[in-house]
């Protein structure tokens, strides 16, 4: 089965449409070259056609993540391509991070940052587009790429995108070609192997950062956390905490969106929502312990999601939000240490840092605060 991330299917559609536009025959599979000289992959294409008397082209692909419950599974992708003469083909960059020969448009259903209106697209996805489209570009031409995800807006409403400041659709934030199944035993095995490898390196200084998912990885890199210390964990946090202690980690930072890490504060250490949730219940419990008014506690308990509960609190009582999440960050550290010490005696220091819906580091436990301060980072107030 072709288990590729959404950016791969987007680039495959764009490449197919470009091939048709420059006169090449339609192929039901496109060869996609990967960054860093990795081997290329073959990606199925549904259809491709010329439009407007050959002035534009359109290709369609369907994302096959291989995961039955993945939000991008089966998503239809439309890639519109148009070439223009007189474009520049240098390596210069424009404001949105693309080379000046590539005019990228996030169409309907593609996520955009609410603050800037710019497309939410990872560097991996940008590189993938450039690597695969540039060789097809006629000399002296530039290319306009518009991506549309007809179901993107509806699918995104079932995610936490808005909590990261991303609106209007699905993010194109994959950091690799192949899908990592975050709740599978194979993913745990692979992550443990990566952890052991990092801890065995001569330059290892005893410090690691666990980031949760693609958004966590994206923000960790933007904040300048040491890349050689970062591991994307997926959902197997409990076993990985123990593995970190077993491999001699001295300082561990848990860095992520509160929607995932909230579960740790309630003692839930496998965080995939199909296996364990309880976030509203945990949030309600913490609000009670912090002495939040009964009316607000009742609103929280009846919320349909953590995000909605937060929005309610932010409007009605911003001070309560700060109290709840500060307590939560501390509880994450306490519960995580207790979890590790259930299985082995360890002096590993565990810190937690949570970011908010505006993609800002907002809350940290005492150990988390020490660790980010040592890196020259401060919390947003």
UniProtKB/Swiss-Prot annotation:
The keyword Transferase applies. It comes from the Bacteria. This is Cobalt-precorrin-5B C(1)-methyltransferase. It catalyses: Co-precorrin-5B + S-adenosyl-L-methionine = Co-precorrin-6A + S-adenosyl-L-homocysteine. Gene3D superfamilies: CbiD-like. The keyword Methyltransferase applies. Pathway: Cofactor biosynthesis; adenosylcobalamin biosynthesis; cob(II)yrinate a,c-diamide from sirohydrochlorin (anaerobic route): step 6/10. Its EC number is 2.1.1.195. Belongs to the CbiD family. Keywords: Cobalamin biosynthesis, Methyltransferase, S-adenosyl-L-methionine, Transferase. InterPro entries: CbiD, CbiD_sf. Pfam families: CbiD (PF01888).
